[in-house]
């Protein structure tokens, strides 16, 4: 259901378990980021039996079809970031492209079991933004069942940049030893104290699964 008049205030009582938040997404980086930012703000209403639907994904469209043509298409990095964001947002993972035409790099994105596990986590909490959410830096945190936290570092700008991950806004202390795993690259990064720094390419995202040692 897509509504313009406080749809989120009455849809639960109508028996709906998920609802479209906005109009149609486009196959473009600008559209993906805009929709994701707006969906982040709707986090407090999401949860078990009440899922925010930012729209089906444009991963793999490559500029084809109506949505692809009006958007123009995205790079593989942009599609990867798109899938990562939807997983962090606990959004329905609806593929909008023809999977028969998938390239291996698209399959690698949409079949990432570690990201899907974050999306389907039993706690059912949507990611929230850590301060600050400005200057092209968007850092999201998603609490997971069992005490882990998933973090997403999104660089929406046109240039690569170093981004800082700080976990003291998530109930952990900066002096805690935190083990990080890059679930985008399926790679353990080791233990960290006092936060961590990451080089994030333009129009890209890194998702990390963290637990306190």
Where are these regions (language model features)?
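Generic recognition of flexible, low-complexity loop/linker segments
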Residues: 73-75, 136-141, 195-196
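Solvent-exposed beta-hairpin/edge-strand motifs
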Residues: 168-185
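Short, glycine-/Ser/Thr-/acidic-enriched flexible segments
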Residues: 64, 100, 123, 145-146, ...
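Carbohydrate-binding surface patches
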Residues: 86-89, 94-96, 133-172
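C-terminal beta-strand-rich structural cap/linker in extracellular carbohydrate-active enzymes
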Residues: 190-213
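Glycan-recognition surfaces
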Residues: 1-98
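Hydrophobic, well-ordered secondary-structure elements that form the walls
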Residues: 151, 180, 203
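Catalytic cores of secreted or luminal carbohydrate-active enzymes
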Residues: 81-131
